[in-house]
């Protein structure tokens, strides 16, 4: 009697060389970098030449793993990381992601002036009114 078992890949993001990370604390907060080398359980070596992140060892508590990865040899130099980053189109993929769009929207809303916030409120009221009107017709 044979039973077929299905091997399924994990859904969580693994700490691996070539994984793109978003730095959430420190001097380079909000910038993207790639994991170049895993130092130990809590630290990795990152490099982000396109985003202006210097090559540095960073604690995993200071970064967020993104779903983006690209092929990168272990311990790659900055020039290699830069070439592979550009070839994989990481910046374009990140800009197209809903995560990046949400961050951009949050920054845009934080930068609104009082009058712009008022305009947003008026537009939301207009939208709500048209929806109510359409529901009343139906």
UniProtKB/Swiss-Prot annotation:
Signal peptide: none annotated. InterPro entries: KOW, Rib_uL2_dom2, Ribosomal_eL14, Ribosomal_eL14_dom, Translation_prot_SH3-like_sf. One of its GO terms (cellular component) is cytosol. It comes from the Eukaryota. Component of the large ribosomal subunit (LSU). Mature yeast ribosomes consist of a small (40S) and a large (60S) subunit. The 40S small subunit contains 1 molecule of ribosomal RNA (18S rRNA) and 33 different proteins (encoded by 57 genes). The large 60S subunit contains 3 rRNA molecules (25S, 5.8S and 5S rRNA) and 46 different proteins (encoded by 81 genes). Pfam families: KOW, Ribosomal_L14e. GO terms for molecular function: RNA binding; structural constituent of ribosome. PANTHER family: 60S RIBOSOMAL PROTEIN L14, LARGE RIBOSOMAL SUBUNIT PROTEIN EL14. Component of the ribosome, a large ribonucleoprotein complex responsible for the synthesis of proteins in the cell. The small ribosomal subunit (SSU) binds messenger RNAs (mRNAs) and translates the encoded message by selecting cognate aminoacyl-transfer RNA (tRNA) molecules. The large subunit (LSU) contains the ribosomal catalytic site termed the peptidyl transferase center (PTC), which catalyzes the formation of peptide bonds, thereby polymerizing the amino acids delivered by tRNAs into a polypeptide chain. CDD domains: eL14 (cd23702). The gene is RPL14B. This is Large ribosomal subunit protein eL14B. Present with 35100 molecules/cell in log phase SD medium. There are 2 genes for eL14 in yeast. Belongs to the eukaryotic ribosomal protein eL14 family. The keyword Ribosomal protein applies.
């Amino acid at each position: 009697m044979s039973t077929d078992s299905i091997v399924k890949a994990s859904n969580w993001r693994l700490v691996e060389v070539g994984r793109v990370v978003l730095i959430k604390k420190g001097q380079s907060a909000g910038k993207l970098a790639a994991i170049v080398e895993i130092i130990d359980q809590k630290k990795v070596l990152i490099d982000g030449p396109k985003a202006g992140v210097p090559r540095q060892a960073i604690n995993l508590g200071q970064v967020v793993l993104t779903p983006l990865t690209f092929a990168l040899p272990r311990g790659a130099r900055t020039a290699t990381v830069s070439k592979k980053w550009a070839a994989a189109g990481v910046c374009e993929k990140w800009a197209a992601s809903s995560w990046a769009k949400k961050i951009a929207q949050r920054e845009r809303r934080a930068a609104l002036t009082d009058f712009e916030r008022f305009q947003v409120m008026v537009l939301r009221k207009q939208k709500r009114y048209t929806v109510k009107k359409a529901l009343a017709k139906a």
